[in-house]
Amino acid sequence: MVCGLADLGQLDSRGNKVADFLLVIDMQSDYVAVGKAYHEELTAAVNDKIASYPSDRVIYILNRFFWERKDRKKKFATGLLLVSSRIFEKRRASCFTNPDLKDFLEENGAKSMEFIGVDGNGCVKASVLAAVKENYQVSVDLSAVGVVNQKKFQNILYKWRSIGVAVEGELL
């Protein structure tokens, strides 16, 4: 059963209930930089959310397209708060296509996760849907999610809510 954060027991630095893990999706210089679709405002919102979690509960997901060379180092967005060395790469939209991430979550007894990052119509969407399919309790903070096509995103938001994803905040 998918349920909201009200069912969780962990508290953040402000005493609010949080998920077992925060997954920061694709906050990298390929997408978040001057001249790109997302910029400092999103990075600041993402940093606020990261700062609210214990550092050992923050997981960063980097996207490496299937055609990109593995020896080319991926760079996080300028100014992104890096509090953890838990970094997993993915080569497809969903972060759950990385078996190492799935193993890590299982080994650490994860039952719930919160998603932030980019894009709500792409990799965040795919990862949220995959997490629900894997029977995790899932939440999304829209104030820390980048969305280029907000009209298209309304359908995704409806789908998330209809399958029990806890949605909070407003898009920037």
Which residues does each predicted region cover?
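Active-site acidic carboxylates
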Residues: 2-89, 102, 107-111, 165-166
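Histidine-anchored nucleotide/phosphate-binding helix
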Residues: 45-53, 122-133
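Structural recognition of alpha->loop->beta junctions
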Residues: 79-88, 148-172
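Short beta->alpha junction loops
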Residues: 88-94, 143-146
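Short phosphate-binding loop-to-helix
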Residues: 93-101
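Active-site neighborhoods of divalent-metal-dependent phosphate/nucleic-acid chemistry enzymes
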Residues: 108, 112, 116-121
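A short glycine-rich beta-strand->turn/loop micro-motif centered on a GG-aromatic cluster
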Residues: 114-117, 135-150
